[in-house]
């Protein structure tokens, strides 16, 4: 749910932006534009090199803590 519904629809209230990948706006950085392309937990750098339709998050790319994917809905257990 997180990847597809969270990021494809912008991550607002759908489960992928900010605090623990639930809700939205915790810390605010990267939410909206960031979470639309990127992933959830880490609020810094999400959307800039993480996801962008590739389907997987990566801490090495953008520091997304739990590796929530992109609009494709991939990446629940991918903790890189």
Curated annotation (Swiss-Prot):
Gene designation per UniProt: KRTAP6-1
Q: Give the species this sequence originates from.
A: Oryctolagus cuniculus
- Xref: PANTHER family: KERATIN-ASSOCIATED PROTEIN 6-1 (PTHR31678:SF2), KERATIN-ASSOCIATED PROTEIN 6-3 (PTHR31678)
GO terms, biological process: keratinization
Functional summary from the UniProt entry: In the hair cortex, hair keratin intermediate filaments are embedded in an interfilamentous matrix, consisting of hair keratin-associated proteins (KRTAP), which are essential for the formation of a rigid and resistant hair shaft through their extensive disulfide bond cross-linking with abundant cysteine residues of hair keratins. The matrix proteins include the high-sulfur and high-glycine-tyrosine keratins.
Cell wall biogenesis/degradation among the record's keywords? no
User: Any idea which UniProt keywords this protein has?
Assistant: Keratin
Specify the protein name.
Keratin-associated protein 6-1
Q: How does it assemble?
A: Interacts with hair keratins.
Q: Any keyword Oxidoreductase?
A: no
Gene Ontology cellular-component terms listed? intermediate filament
Report the family membership.
Answer: Belongs to the KRTAP type 6 family.
């Amino acid at each position: 749910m997180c990847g597809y519904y969270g990021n494809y629809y912008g991550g607002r209230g759908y489960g992928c932006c900010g605090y623990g990948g639930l809700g939205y706006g915790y810390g605010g950085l990267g939410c909206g534009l960031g979470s639309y392309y990127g992933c959830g937990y880490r609020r810094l750098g999400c959307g800039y090199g993480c996801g962008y339709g590739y389907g997987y998050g990566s801490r090495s790319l953008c520091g997304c803590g739990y590796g929530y994917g992109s609009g494709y809905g991939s990446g629940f257990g991918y903790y890189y």
